Amino acid sequence: MTTFRMPADEAEARAVQDALRARVVLDEPGPPPGTGRVTGVDVAYDDERDLVVAAAVVLDAATLEVVAESTADGRVTFPYVPGLLAFREIPAVLAALERLPVDPGLVVCDGYGRAHPRRFGLASHLGVLTGLPVIGVAKNPFTFRYEQPGPRRGDFTPLMDGDEEVGRALRTRDATKPVFVSVGHRTGLDNACAHTLALTRGFRQPETTRRADALCRSALREAAG
């Protein structure tokens, strides 16, 4: 695992993203959907106390049963800046991943990978630092454009930045808003979408994200006292 160092300011943070982006691996397909383990990571904030709590929940990819889970909390030490949110979240997320008693397998972030102004969102950043295959599944398209996919589960359209496809708008339930899938590290876009569909058997959001969201919110309530 590569050591994370907090940048001193926004300019240094952008320089870190630009430097690490060259280490993103895009020519691996990633593990097959429905095999091994998948891990959801998410964070929750107490802004009044500058507190962040991260959760990591490992599921069996075939059954979606919980295998292991962990949490970590810490102080928020980087300001809220669009495009630099990873620097607020990664220290706690890394700590939560390190506390897991099992290998996490594929990691699913509630956020972006290549679908980022510098092509280096949280999913890519986390992948480069850990060496794990990571995908991003977000609830909104950030600043990118897309056409509405067809109404059926599995329908998708490209998420575009100019002429470049940076992800996909993917329908995970019939007649429900799409989610926005992008590659983080050591996965392909087709495979990332297949994993997302395998993890959304009854809801719009992946089960990994739903579980991690619930756990970090519960842990935040306990940490905030």
Mark where each language-model region is.
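C-terminal binding/interaction regions
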Residues: 2-27, 90, 139-140, 148-225
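Catalytic-site beta-strand/loop segments enriched in glycine and acidic/polar residues
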Residues: 94-126, 130-132
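Short hydrophobic alpha-helical runs that function as membrane-insertion/retention elements
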Residues: 133-138
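Two-metal-ion RNase H-like nuclease active-site motif
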Residues: 36-45
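A glycine-rich, hydrophobic loop/mini-helix early in the fold
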Residues: 47-103
